[in-house]
Amino acid sequence: QAEESCLQNLASRYLQTVTDYGKDLVEKALAPELQAQAKAYFEKTQEQLTPLVKKIGNDLLNFFSHFIELKTQPAT
Protein backbone atom coordinates (compact mmCIF):
# COMPACT_ATOMS: atom_id res chain seq x y z
CA GLN A 1 0.00 0.00 0.00
CA ALA A 2 2.75 2.46 0.97
CA GLU A 3 4.81 1.52 -2.08
CA GLU A 4 1.79 2.03 -4.35
CA SER A 5 1.16 5.45 -2.81
CA CYS A 6 4.81 6.36 -3.30
CA LEU A 7 4.64 5.36 -6.98
CA GLN A 8 1.44 7.36 -7.46
CA ASN A 9 3.09 10.35 -5.84
CA LEU A 10 6.16 9.95 -8.04
CA ALA A 11 4.03 9.60 -11.18
CA SER A 12 1.98 12.63 -10.18
CA ARG A 13 5.08 14.76 -9.63
CA TYR A 14 6.56 13.56 -12.94
CA LEU A 15 3.35 14.43 -14.80
CA GLN A 16 3.23 17.86 -13.14
CA THR A 17 6.87 18.52 -14.07
CA VAL A 18 6.26 17.52 -17.69
CA THR A 19 3.12 19.69 -17.79
CA ASP A 20 4.95 22.70 -16.35
CA TYR A 21 7.81 22.20 -18.80
CA GLY A 22 5.35 22.02 -21.69
CA LYS A 23 3.64 25.25 -20.60
CA ASP A 24 6.97 27.05 -20.30
CA LEU A 25 8.02 25.78 -23.71
CA VAL A 26 4.79 26.98 -25.35
CA GLU A 27 5.09 30.41 -23.69
CA LYS A 28 8.68 30.78 -24.84
CA ALA A 29 7.78 29.71 -28.37
CA LEU A 30 4.80 32.07 -28.60
CA ALA A 31 6.46 35.11 -27.05
CA PRO A 32 8.58 36.09 -30.09
CA GLU A 33 5.65 35.45 -32.44
CA LEU A 34 3.33 37.64 -30.38
CA GLN A 35 5.97 40.35 -30.12
CA ALA A 36 6.42 40.30 -33.90
CA GLN A 37 2.66 40.52 -34.44
CA ALA A 38 2.34 43.42 -32.00
CA LYS A 39 5.25 45.26 -33.61
CA ALA A 40 3.74 44.80 -37.08
CA TYR A 41 0.37 46.03 -35.82
CA PHE A 42 1.82 49.18 -34.27
CA GLU A 43 3.96 49.91 -37.33
CA LYS A 44 0.94 49.54 -39.63
CA THR A 45 -1.18 51.70 -37.34
CA GLN A 46 1.48 54.40 -37.27
CA GLU A 47 1.84 54.21 -41.05
CA GLN A 48 -1.90 54.73 -41.48
CA LEU A 49 -2.31 57.42 -38.82
CA THR A 50 0.67 59.62 -39.69
CA PRO A 51 -0.84 61.11 -42.86
CA LEU A 52 -4.17 61.63 -41.09
CA VAL A 53 -2.55 63.44 -38.16
CA LYS A 54 -0.55 65.63 -40.55
CA LYS A 55 -3.70 66.51 -42.48
CA ILE A 56 -5.59 67.35 -39.28
CA GLY A 57 -2.70 69.55 -38.14
CA ASN A 58 -2.61 71.32 -41.49
CA ASP A 59 -6.39 71.79 -41.48
CA LEU A 60 -6.25 73.24 -37.96
CA LEU A 61 -3.53 75.68 -38.96
CA ASN A 62 -5.57 76.78 -41.96
CA PHE A 63 -8.67 77.11 -39.79
CA PHE A 64 -6.94 79.29 -37.19
CA SER A 65 -5.07 81.33 -39.77
CA HIS A 66 -8.42 82.15 -41.38
CA PHE A 67 -9.61 83.68 -38.09
CA ILE A 68 -6.34 85.58 -37.70
CA GLU A 69 -6.77 87.02 -41.19
CA LEU A 70 -10.32 88.10 -40.33
CA LYS A 71 -9.08 89.92 -37.20
CA THR A 72 -6.29 91.72 -39.02
CA GLN A 73 -8.48 92.98 -41.86
CA PRO A 74 -9.76 96.53 -41.38
CA ALA A 75 -13.45 96.88 -40.77
CA THR A 76 -15.39 98.24 -43.72
Swiss-Prot record:
The cellular location(s) given in this protein's UniProt record come to:
Secreted
- State one molecular function term (GO): lipid binding
Arranged from A to Z, the UniProt key words for this protein are: Disulfide bond, HDL, Lipid transport, Pyrrolidone carboxylic acid, Secreted, Transport
Q: In which tissues is it expressed?
A: Plasma.
In the record, which positions carry Pyrrolidone carboxylic acid? Q1
Q: Name one GO biological process term.
A: lipoprotein metabolic process
Q: Which InterPro entries match?
A: ApoA-II, ApoA-II_sf
Gene Ontology annotations for the cellular component aspect, listed alphabetically: spherical high-density lipoprotein particle
Described by its record, this protein's role is as follows: May stabilize HDL (high density lipoprotein) structure by its association with lipids, and affect the HDL metabolism.
Assembly and oligomerization: Homodimer; disulfide-linked. Interacts with NAXE and NDRG1.
Q: Which PANTHER family match?
A: APOLIPOPROTEIN A-II (PTHR11027:SF0)
Family in the record: Belongs to the apolipoprotein A2 family.
Q: What is this protein called?
A: Apolipoprotein A-II
What organism is this sequence from? Equus caballus (Horse)
